UniProtKB/Swiss-Prot annotation:
GO MF, any single term: structural constituent of ribosome
Family, similarity comment: Belongs to the bacterial ribosomal protein bL21 family.
Single Gene Ontology BP annotation: translation
Lineage, top ranks: Bacteria, Pseudomonadati, Thermodesulfobacteriota, Desulfuromonadia, Geobacterales
Subunit structure: Part of the 50S ribosomal subunit. Contacts protein L20.
Keywords for the protein's UniProt record, in alphabetical order: Ribonucleoprotein, Ribosomal protein, RNA-binding, rRNA-binding
SUPFAM superfamilies from the UniProt entry: L21p-like
Function: This protein binds to 23S rRNA in the presence of protein L20.
Protein known as: Large ribosomal subunit protein bL21
The species this protein was found in: Trichlorobacter lovleyi (strain ATCC BAA-1151 / DSM 17278 / SZ) (Geobacter lovleyi)
PROSITE patterns in the cross-refs: RIBOSOMAL_L21
Amino acid sequence: MYAVIKTGGKQYKVAEGDFLKVEKLDNIVGDTIEFGEVLMIGGDAVKVGAPLVAGASVTAKVAVQGRDKKILVFKSKRRKNSRKLIGHRQYHTVLKIEKISA
């Protein structure tokens, strides 16, 4: 059984036991989160919401709070010898999907 959930303005396809990396959520490691925005549930029978599946939820546990690898942002202006190099590390949360209920 799998589900499509919406969090952080993005949609993710998840199944029980999966690990999912999403935008940072304000929870500590070990917390349980319930996602009510379930767009679709698949498996033997497919349920597609309009826009959400009524009564469906996905339960996940916070596994890791961390940061991504550094990306480098380089800005320059032509013919001016003006250059700027900036590094950025985005915060993320890793979730373990525990239960999909419809």
